[in-house]
């Protein structure tokens, strides 16, 4: 297809750059005819998912950088934050998620990424990592930050920095 993954296609639709027969598409599940004219207009989001845009914005607004650092993406899913970290100089990213089979293929095959799928962050310890984390991101919705921060403190360096995107359901 035109787009490398469903998540990427959904991200482009939500970004408002997908048009079908000259009409902007705003629903990812919308059915279209096989002979429809599909176009992607404007700029690609640049990451495997919209999550990368969230972290990019945080790095523009706050003095945060993964450059030259060992990082962790907590709640990695498709890997938008992971992708953003790598594109901004991360030397390694531990991509942690309780789900599996979600991380984009380009990240799964990147030697700088340690795919920790089927892993609950509450169970991660420093001895599971080759080195402590210097930069981390959190993008979760089904676990309280109350459970995440003690783990983050235990696996990070004293001067580690992070960005948190949280949706309380």
Provide a role label for each language-model segment.
Residues 100-130:
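S-adenosyl-L-methionine
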Residues 143-151:
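A short, conserved alpha-helix within the catalytic core of class I
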Residues 1-36:
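A basic, amphipathic helix-loop patch mediating RNA/tRNA/ribosome contacts
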